[in-house]
């Protein structure tokens, strides 16, 4: 039977709604919070100026995991007649005797809660101080967890001003979004009053209380910037401080809008679920995303700190000053911050070739968006629990990639001018995706909305098939799906085309399924024989689509590759497209191997990084698809990657480039994983020296992962000395990066007992919940059954320990995607049939689809008659 409709006028009418009603909105919050870090609880009181704009007897706001003192609730002196807390909906409904007066009134209430250990809401994080374990109090409110700290209108569109007061132990540092206005000390407790904030959304309110050191800088406008670290680690904050100051200066100039707050603090938090969080004026980070130590940090971690800081500070404009109206438009926050971070870091470190590395983001988005279980950039959100799952490669990486495509189409100058207008128009308020398109259209005069709606409102992207017919070029678009089916989508595609030259470009908009470019051959230099004629679509991979060439054009491109006629970005695009077409069984694995072989003299970090991803993927699938050939395929890839690895060696060279410093460990790790004996033996030798002398120059931070994997290569239950040595390194290391490095290798082993021991570390105090993904990510194909059995046996425990956190998705994704058969997909589906929750439902569906995609790819590979011949031919080629 269907449930009866809620009686008119009852609190039940507000249940099951995606959003809060609009008849009342907060204008200003006065909050006082008293965290008790020993008892891990907090008390608080709120006084909220509420504007009632339509006749109502109700006030409806969000609250969750809080005890609200019902007797304390008053609105303009009136006590509610009914107080209903609906836990599933996370709403608090206050019902009054008569209609509330229109206009502004004050809602007051007291409440209390627990400083939880779930890394959301108002929570506790453990740290060591002088040999003692202490708690700090931290907030993490995005997306929907401010309601776990204080009752509020917890939606981005309800912007209000915030005036915070904290009562904390006198010896502690207490930070919030705004600077301290005044402070009074009464014995062991100090009361800190903060300045009132400008209009802002609840998810950006932040508090951090603990013991900290800091380093300080100042922007060109005089804004004070600080990086707070655990006591004794402040020198590790200097690099992030430098990037922070430079980023604020860069964005101020780019948007022609000053940083809106008087100060910016960045704080390293030991327990932190995300990589970082852009709270207005008080940005919080995982330690490894903020701290950099010249002695113990690798080049890739240094780059990660720069990109992460630049990303979070871009949010101070795109997200905080101008905020998305609802979570459907999350991509406006994350896509733009991702794109802007590359723009700014490229200006700080042009030698890093960061835009070439940006293609990692595009590849990641193309991979997810070629699944039927992907979602549009603009995704409908019906329940708070669904929001966490869209903080994914679509919102971040596809968002950033289509922004890059649009900037390329409009031109950098027009694009910047439009963004500046947009920021100024919507400052201190909210915007939807359409609002951005309207400003871009107004400034550029181009049909931006029609073009971009095809990319943000529909899921997926096209593959453009290119055929040479006489002197003409035929183009056809189809939705690209890895499962081999074809969707019905049609996109307006900004096509760029290079003919025999990177510089001679043709541009057009492909608006229909088919198009013809007439006399393309005569427009290029005359069609020469001898391999000089070639055509490349999607120059520098600025477009978010794949390209499939006919045989003649494919051969010509391979020649152009070998003759080094293409840009690095174009080389990457060709490799990634060929890999995806192979997985989708639209091209043979043999043709992919021939293409990879054309890169045998490659030396560039970004290109080799993508080749390494492809060789790793093919090596793994070959274990199941062609077990007899798997060894030879690995040898072929060793042949490909060994020359650049030999050239770089294990030891860094004086004055070498940042990119070579990142290339060395990537190649060494790849060779170890492919089973190259010499590399494994050398890694093991260097580890033994390092284990006895941590200061040896023979194992730098960059090359340690390769050495650790070399150690694990020979570990078993009967030969566990290497494993125990790595555990000792883990336990003795004070640096977060070093701990992560070891964690990522401990489960990289075929031995069942060792794998289980490593996975069970997740349940101990030795591994912080935020780092569990590292252990999971290390599991190799040969140990997948062990890991799957462990996941099933421990699912209830995992669900409890990681509930309410996006981290639970890591368990599913890491283990499920190791499988490649329809039978296994059915078994896993059956297990989760009664265990799925909205917080990880999308991840589970995507992971299961990936299993079926792999199963189909295996069938395709097994059907290739000439694969063995190709492998042996390439393997024995001089």
UniProtKB/Swiss-Prot annotation:
GO terms for biological process: peptide catabolic process; proteolysis. GO terms for cellular component: cytoplasm; endoplasmic reticulum; extracellular space; membrane. Belongs to the peptidase M1 family. It comes from Oryza sativa subsp. japonica (Rice). The record marks 396 as: Transition state stabilizer. One of its GO terms (molecular function) is alanyl aminopeptidase activity. This is Aminopeptidase M1-C. Keywords: Aminopeptidase, Cytoplasm, Endoplasmic reticulum, Hydrolase, Membrane, Metal-binding, Metalloprotease, Microsome, Protease, Zinc. Its EC number is 3.4.11.2. CDD domains: M1_APN-Q_like. It is a peripheral membrane protein. Gene3D superfamilies: 1.25.50.20, 2.60.40.1910, Neutral Protease Domain 2, tricorn interacting facor f3 domain. Its cofactor is Zn(2+). SUPFAM superfamilies: Leukotriene A4 hydrolase N-terminal domain (SSF63737), Metalloproteases ('zincins'), catalytic domain (SSF55486). Zn(2+) binds at residues 311, 315, 334. PROSITE patterns: ZINC_PROTEASE. It is an enzyme of class 3 (hydrolase).
């Amino acid at each position: 039977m269907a449930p009866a409709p809620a009686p008119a006028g009852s609190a039940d009418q507000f249940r099951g709604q995606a959003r809060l009603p609009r008849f009342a909105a907060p204008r200003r919050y006065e909050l006082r919070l008293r965290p008790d870090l020993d008892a891990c609880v907090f008390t608080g009181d709120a006084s909220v100026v509420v504007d009632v704009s339509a006749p109502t007897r109700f006030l409806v706001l969000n609250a969750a995991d809080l005890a609200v003192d019902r007797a304390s609730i008053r609105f303009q002196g009136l006590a509610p007649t009914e107080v209903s807390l609906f836990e599933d909906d996370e709403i608090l409904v206050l019902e009054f005797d008569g209609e509330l007066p229109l206009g502004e009134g004050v809602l007051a209430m007291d409440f209390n809660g627990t400083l939880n250990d779930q890394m959301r809401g108002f929570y506790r994080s453990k740290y060591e101080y002088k040999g003692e374990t202490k708690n700090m109090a931290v907030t993490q409110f995005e997306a929907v967890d401010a309601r776990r700290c204080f009752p509020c209108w917890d939606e981005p569109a309800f912007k209000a001003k915030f005036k915070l007061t904290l009562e904390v132990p006198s010896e502690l540092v207490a930070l919030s979004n705004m600077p301290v206005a005044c402070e009074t000390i009464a014995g062991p407790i100090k009361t800190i009053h903060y300045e009132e904030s400008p209009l802002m959304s609840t998810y950006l309110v932040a508090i951090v209380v603990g013991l900290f050191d800091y380093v300080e800088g100042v922007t060109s406008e005089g804004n004070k910037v600080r990086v707070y670290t655990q006591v004794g680690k402040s020198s590790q904050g200097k690099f992030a401080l430098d990037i922070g100051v430079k980023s604020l200066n860069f964005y101020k100039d780019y948007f022609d809008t000053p940083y809106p707050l008087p100060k910016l603090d960045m704080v390293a938090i030991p327990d932190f679920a995300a990589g970082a969080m852009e709270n207005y004026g008080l940005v919080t980070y995982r330690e490894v995303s903020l701290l950099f130590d010249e002695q113990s940090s690798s080049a890739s971690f240094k780059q990660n700190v720069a990109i992460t800081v630049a990303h979070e500070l871009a949010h101070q404009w795109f997200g905080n000053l101008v905020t998305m109206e609802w979570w459907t438009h999350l991509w406006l926050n994350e896509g733009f911050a991702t794109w802007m971070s590359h723009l700014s870091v490229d200006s700080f470190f042009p030698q890093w070739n960061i835009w070439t590395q940006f293609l990692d983001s595009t590849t990641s988005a193309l991979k997810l968006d070629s699944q039927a279980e992907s979602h549009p950039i603009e995704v409908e959100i019906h329940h708070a629990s669904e929001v966490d799952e869209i903080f994914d490669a679509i919102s971040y990486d596809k968002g950033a990639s289509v922004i890059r495509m649009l900037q390329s189409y409009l031109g950098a100058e027009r694009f910047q001018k439009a963004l500046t207008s947009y920021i100024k128009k919507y400052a201190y308020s909210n915007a939807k995706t359409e609002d951005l398109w309207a400003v871009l259209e107004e400034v550029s005069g181009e049909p931006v909305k029609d073009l971009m709606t095809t990319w943000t409102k529909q899921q997926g992207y096209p593959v453009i098939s290119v055929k040479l017919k006489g002197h003409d070029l035929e183009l056809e678009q189809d939705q690209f799906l890895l499962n081999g089916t074809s969707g019905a989508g049609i996109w307006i595609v900004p096509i760029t085309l290079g003919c025999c030259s990177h510089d001679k470009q043709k541009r057009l908009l492909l608006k229909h399924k088919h198009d013809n470019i007439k006399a393309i051959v005569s427009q290029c230099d005359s069609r020469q024989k001898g391999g000089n004629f070639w055509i490349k679509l999607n120059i520098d991979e600025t477009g978010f689509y794949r390209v499939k060439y006919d045989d003649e054009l494919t051969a010509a491109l391979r020649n152009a590759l070998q003759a080094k006629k293409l840009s690095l970005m174009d080389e990457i695009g060709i490799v990634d497209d060929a890999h995806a077409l192979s997985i989708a069984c639209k091209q043979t694995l043999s043709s992919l191997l021939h293409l990879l072989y054309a890169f045998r003299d490659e030396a560039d970090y970004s290109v080799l990084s993508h080749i390494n991803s492809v060789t790793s993927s093919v090596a793994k699938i070959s274990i199941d698809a062609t077990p007899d050939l798997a060894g030879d395929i690995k040898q072929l890839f060793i042949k490909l990657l060994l020359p650049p690895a030999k050239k770089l060696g294990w030891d860094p060279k004086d004055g070498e480039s940042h990119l070579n410093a990142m290339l060395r460990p990537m190649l060494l790790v790849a060779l170890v994983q492919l089973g190259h004996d010499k590399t494994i033996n050398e890694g093991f030798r260097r580890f033994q020296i390092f284990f006895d002398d941590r200061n040896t120059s023979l194992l730098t931070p960059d090359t340690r992962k390769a050495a650790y994997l070399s150690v694990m290569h020979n570990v078993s239950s009967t030969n566990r000395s290497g494993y125990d040595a790595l555990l000792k390194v883990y336990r003795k290391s004070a640096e977060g990066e070093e701990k992560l490095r070891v964690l990522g290798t401990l489960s990289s082993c075929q031995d069942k007992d060792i794998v289980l021991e490593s996975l069970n570390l997740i349940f101990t105090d030795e591994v912080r919940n935020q780092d569990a993904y590292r252990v999971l990510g290390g599991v190799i194909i040969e140990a997948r059954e062990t890991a799957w059995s462990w996941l099933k046996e421990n699912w209830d425990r995992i669900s409890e320990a990681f509930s309410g956190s996006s981290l639970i998705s890591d368990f599913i994704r890491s283990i499920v995607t190791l499988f490649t058969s329809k039978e296994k997909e059915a078994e896993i589906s059956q297990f989760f049939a009664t265990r799925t929750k909205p917080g990880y439902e999308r991840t589970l569906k995507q992971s299961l689809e990936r299993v079926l995609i792999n199963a189909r790819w295996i069938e395709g590979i097994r059907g290739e008659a000439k694969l063995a011949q190709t492998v042996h031919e390439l393997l024995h080629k001089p």
